[in-house]
Structure formats: C-alpha cells, structure tokens
From Swiss-Prot:
Name of the encoding gene: ligA
Organism: Clostridium perfringens (strain SM101 / Type A)
Reaction it catalyzes: NAD(+) + (deoxyribonucleotide)n-3'-hydroxyl + 5'-phospho-(deoxyribonucleotide)m = (deoxyribonucleotide)n+m + AMP + beta-nicotinamide D-nucleotide
Protein name as catalogued: DNA ligase
Enzyme class: ligase
A single Gene Ontology CC term: cytosol
Length: 662
C-alpha cells in the first residue's frame, strides 16, 4: 500500500479510537494495540515527512512559543448575567413572558411557548475552536475580551477529547470550557514542585502557558455547549444545536434538562446543588437559556449580556481567610497530623473554621505560614483543605514549627516518610481511645452502647491498654465510672460477651490493619477463608485479591509481622473471641461476575440488604458508574449515576426488572 495512504488510514483509525476512549468512555481497542499503531504512524511520518494537520501525533509538541498571537472571533463570546436567588430568576422569567405576550399579540408569526434548556456552568476557561470547510481544527482561542482572544491552538491540541477533524463542510466556531478534573489535579499536584491552588487555575494556567509540554502535563478535559458561528443553514432550537455538537464528536456533559416552569427550574437547581460536590470537576452554577433561536434573536442583547440566558451562581467553593494557628492531633495509628485553625469564613453555605494541612512537607510545598491569608477549598471532604497562600500576605508571618514530642502524651516523635508518629501506643490516650472505639464499632465487633466517652473512662480509670483488656472487665469496677449504674454496667458486659461470636470479616476489620476497610476485609476473607491463611499470605497472593494493590498488601504483611499484633490476636482468641467464616454458595445468576451500581431509593431493599443480595448473586457492587459497569439498578429519585449510565449506554434496571431477573 502507498505509504501516504497508509498514514491517512492510521490517522483516521487512531482518531476514531481517541473519540471512543475520551468522549464515549468505551474503547474498542487495547492500549497495547493503540500504541502499536500510534508508533507505526510516528515512524511513517518521520520516514515520509508527510504529516496531516489532524494527526494525533500533532497533539503534543515539545515547543515553547515566543508569544501569544491575537485571534478575532467570528462571533462574540458573551458573558452571562448572573442570579443568586430564585427571585432574580423569576424576575428574568417574567420579563421573557411579558416580551413573548406583547410580541405574539402584535405579530402574525407567533413565537412558541417559553422553554428553557438548563446546563451546568463549568468553572474553567472558555475556549473557542475554529474548523475550516474541510472539518480540520485550525484555531483554538481563549475568550479574551469576547471579541478578541489569544491563539492557544497548540495548547488546545493537548486536550485529547477535542477532535482534530470533524465531519462538517461549513466553517464553524464552537464554544466550550477547558477544565481540569480532580483526578488530573491530584496527580499533577502529587508530582509538581509548586502545587496548583485550584482546578480553575490549573486549567487557565495550562492554556496560557507558552510551554506546550507543560500544558500537556496537566491532562485537561473539555465540554462543549454552543455553536458561536456556522456557515450554512441556521439552527431552529438550542436542542438542535446541542444534538449537532454531539453528532460531530465533541465531548459534552451528560446533564441537559428542559424546563417550562419556575418550579421545574427550582428542582433542577436543588438537584445540581446536591450533587455538586460528587462531581470530578468544578461547576459554579447552572446556565438557563431559552430554547427557541428566533425568540433569542428577537430578545437580543444588552451592552454586556444576552437577554435570553442567565447564570444561576452557587455559593463559592473556595475562599481566602487568615491562618490563626495550627493544632497537632494524634490518630489511631499514632500519626500526628496538623489541622489549621482559621478565621471563620463562609464557604459553599458552611462556616469554615478548620482545614487540613496533611503534613510538614505539604506545609512547606504550599508555603503556608502562621498569620498568612490562605486559599481554602471545600470539596467532598468533611474538612476543607488549604491549597496555598496569598503571596502579598506573607510579610510579618511566622513559620509553622514541627512538634518534637507528642502533643497528647509527651513521647518523642519519629519520622516515617513525610509523616510523624508517636510510638507510645499503649500510653498515648488518643491512640488507645480511637483503637478501642474502632474495635467496638458497628461494622467491627459491634459492641452495643459503646461510646468514645466510655473508651476514655476505661483508659483513664480502669487502665485499659489493649483491646483484649475489654474482655477482662469486671462488673464492680465498671460501677466506678461516671454515669454507670448496675444496669448500664451489666448491659456493657453482656454486649462484650455477645461480641465474641463474630464473623471473620468483622474481626479482621476490628483489628485496624492500615488501609484495610470493611470491603477489603470482606474480599480478603472470601479469598483466604481463615485468619491463619491470611497471616501466611504472600505478597503475590494478596495483590491477586480484587482492589488490593501494593500498598494494601504491604500493610497487611507488615501488620502480621508485628509481635504485638500476634500476641493481641492470640489473647483475644484465648479469651473466647470466635471469628467464624461460613462459605456462602453463590447461585448461578445473570449477575454472576457483573459490576452493579445502585442509585435512588428502592421499595423493598435498604442499601445494605440490596448490596448483600447482589453479592450473594455473585455481583460486585460499586459506588460509581464507569464504562466497566454492567448494570445500574435505579429506584426513586435516581440521580447523576442514572444520567451517566444512560449516556454510556449501560443497562438500567427498575427494581421490578431486577426481581424478575432473579
């Protein structure tokens, strides 16, 4: 075959695979086969000097540009007017209603009833892509002033989900948002000398970086939502425009809603606000736009904004505030971690007074100092995180000093990697109390009525220094504890006695093996079936267990090497603790070996019971939808997982359909 023809075929094939993987989330080729074809293309291009402008090899160059050139947009990129209350949305809606009524009263060609299209308002950097009459990407530009932006074509090409060639023979400008996902952000920050402060800065800084190789390191993504300019037949509705964007292979978010009433809009605002922190990218609101294009054209624009759209803005996810102090706390493992004490600040509707700082390396890398103004970010975490400092606020600030002794017991601290530990396991109150509370917890030994206050008293007054000491407690001594009468003392002893008969997975979880949670404990028990087998397990055997990686495997091996660990386990067994494992016979079913996600409220099952049912049928129950998901069982008020499953073409079952299958 002619080498130029072969290059053209390889380019077409590789671009198809990229679309499947980065846009559809479902690849039809293995990574190995893709790499083989990619490097075949690289070699052919070197040999012949023939390179197509839309070849995947042109995505990343080792180039540093001298400057950004200006680009004049064919159609202006408008800002949107903003609302922060439903009342402001109502006022905007009423203006639209009034316009529509007046127009239809005086015009022969009536406008259709108002219908709004709702999409997420992404918190990234707006980009405008231009495609020529052959469908080839020729320019990528920032929004800039709205009329003139900066040419960032080389940077835009590093975004792998953006098509370099599309099936369209009209000159086209399409608008979207370049974003950084939380995964890309965390990976970049784990390796970077200077960590990024937030996802938006990560995206904006990447596209406005003259070093294209640095842009590529940030692994940006993008969503597209608007055709700014298109030669040829115009669109009649926004939904028609969105369908066009999708059919041309551009990455789109799966959330698009049609609303006709304010009540419907309110429900969608509430829904997106609820799932906002579950997303793996930042949004700062919702865009509400009129669907009918003719109505849009007649409504027109103000000097700044289109009259036919408005953005509903959520509360900020990030804020700046003053770092007042650092508090050092001891965890169950003995790790001593810093917590920032902040000047109270409102963040995403919550008053934030504390934030995590991770460790001294993290503090040094981010340049955090006492008295400085710091950037605080709230995501899925219960406690927000400090991302960096405001450079202008550093004058007069103080260095954060690392403690040399344990803040709880005064023992000397030791370094292990980036963390510091207190090794006074038996005499350090926070360590022992948290260990006992974990051991007694519902998903561990399930000792009813046990509390942290009880654990504190057992440590302070009854000299409990190990979990096995719980099984040596005496009735008379319990009566010496605060608020412990005869009934409460006996109830606690009965609950401790009852806990002796436990499942092996609960016992394993109760031991507090580092990095071993409830699910991992269950998976380990299924694989090894006895404590003795697990104690003898090799590294290779451990990593063969589903979801057990190198770190977890090493944690388990190190845990069972400890002489004290084995002593405690043997003592627990000698005191009558009887962990047992009953091998459940898994019935043949359509769910055998399948990955299943449950979303919404089911009529006949709690979350625990449906999980147990699915596992008894041989299924793996997952908490998130991906291209590896086989089924989604959807109940009432199914949320974003349902939407994602639909967009990926995953089989969605109602509760009734699920029961019919089994």
């Amino acid at each position: 075959m002619d080498k130029k023809k072969l290059i053209e075929e390889l380019v077409e094939e590789l671009n198809k695979y990229a679309y499947e993987y980065y846009v559809l989330g479902n690849s039809s080729v293995t990574d190995k086969d893709y790499d083989k074809k990619y490097y075949e293309l690289v070699d052919l291009e070197k040999e012949t000097g023939y390179k197509l402008p839309y070849s995947p090899t042109q995505r990343v160059g080792d180039v540093i540009l001298p400057e950004f050139k200006k680009y004049t947009h064919k159609a202006r990129l408008w800002s949107l007017d903003k609302a922060q209350t439903l009342e402001e949305i109502r006022e905007w809606h009423n203006r639209n209603v009034k316009f529509l009524e007046e127009y239809n009263r005086t015009s022969d060609e009536e406008l259709p009833p108002l219908k709004y299209i709702l999409t997420k308002k992404f918190d990234g950097l707006t980009i405008n892509l231009s495609y020529d009459e052959n469908g080839v990407l020729i320019t990528g530009a920032t929004r800039g002033t709205g009329a003139i932006g900066e040419d960032v074509t080389a940077q835009v090409k590093t975004i792998k989900s953006i098509p370099l060639k599309i099936d369209c023979h009209d000159f086209l400008e399409i608008h979207g948002e370049a974003i950084m996902t939380t995964e890309a952000f965390e990976k970049y920050n784990s390796e970077a000398d200077t960590p990024l402060k937030n996802l938006r800065n990560g995206a904006a800084g990447a596209l406005r970086n003259l070093n294209v190789a640095e842009t590529a390191k940030r692994n940006l993504s993008a969503f597209f939502y608007d055709v700014g300019y298109k030669e040829g037949a115009p669109f009649k509705t926004y939904m028609e425009m969105l369908n066009f964007i999708k059919t041309k292979g551009f990455p789109m978010d799966d959330y698009i809603r049609e609303c006709k009433t304010l009540d419907e809009i309110q429900k969608e605002i509430d829904y997106i606000r609820d799932i906002r922190f579950d997303l793996n990218y930042d949004i700062d609101g919702l865009v509400i736009a009129i669907d009918d294009i003719r109505t849009r054209e007649l409504l027109g624009y103000t000097v700044k904004f289109p009259k036919w759209a408005i953005a509903y803005k959520f509360e900020a996810q990030e804020a700046t505030t003053k770092l007042l102090d650092v508090e050092w706390n001891v965890g169950r493992s003995g790790r001593v971690s810093p917590t920032a004490i902040l000047e109270p600040v409102e963040l995403a509707g919550v008053t934030v007074k504390r934030a995590t700082l991770n460790n001294m390396d993290d503090i040094a890398r981010k340049g955090v100092r006492l008295g400085a103004e710091v950037f605080v970010r709230r995501s899925n975490d219960v406690i927000p995180e400090i991302m960096g400092v405001v450079p202008e606020s550093l004058e007069g600030t103080k260095e954060i000093e690392e403690p040399k002794v344990c803040p709880a017991c005064g023992a000397h601290l030791v370094h292990e990697g980036v963390h510091i530990y207190c090794e006074n396991t038996l005499g350090c109150k926070p360590q022992m109390v948290k260990t006992i509370v974990h051991f007694a917890g519902r998903e561990a030994m399930n000792i009813a009525g046990f509390s942290e206050r009880t654990a504190e008293q057992l440590f302070e007054k009854l000299d409990i220094r190990d979990i096995s000491d719980l099984y040596k407690l005496e009735y008379e001594k319990l009566l010496d504890l605060d608020k412990f009468g005869p009934k409460k003392a006996q109830n606690l002893l009965d609950a401790i006695e009852k806990s002796k008969d436990c499942t092996l997975e609960a016992f394993l979880y109760s031991l507090g093996i580092p990095n071993v949670g409830v699910k991992t404990a269950k998976d380990l028990v299924k694989r090894f079936e006895s404590l003795e087998n697990l104690e003898k397990a090799t590294f290779e055997e451990l990593v063969s267990v589903q979801d057990v990686g190198d770190i977890v495997a090493r944690s388990i091996i190190e845990f069972f090497k400890e002489e004290r660990t084995l002593k405690v386990i043997n003592e627990l067994l000698s005191l009558g603790v009887n962990p047992h494992y009953e091998k459940k016979e898994v019935l043949e079913s359509p769910f055998m070996g399948k990955t299943v996600v449950v979303t919404g409220t089911l009529e006949n099952y709690s979350r625990t019971s449906i999980k147990e049912k699915l596992e008894s049928l041989g299924a793996k129950v997952s908490g998130s939808v991906s291209k590896k998901t086989d089924f989604v069982i959807a109940g009432e008020a199914a949320g974003s997982k349902y939407d994602k499953a639909k967009s990926l073409g995953i089989t969605i079952l109602s509760e009734e359909e699920f029961e019919n299958m089994i």
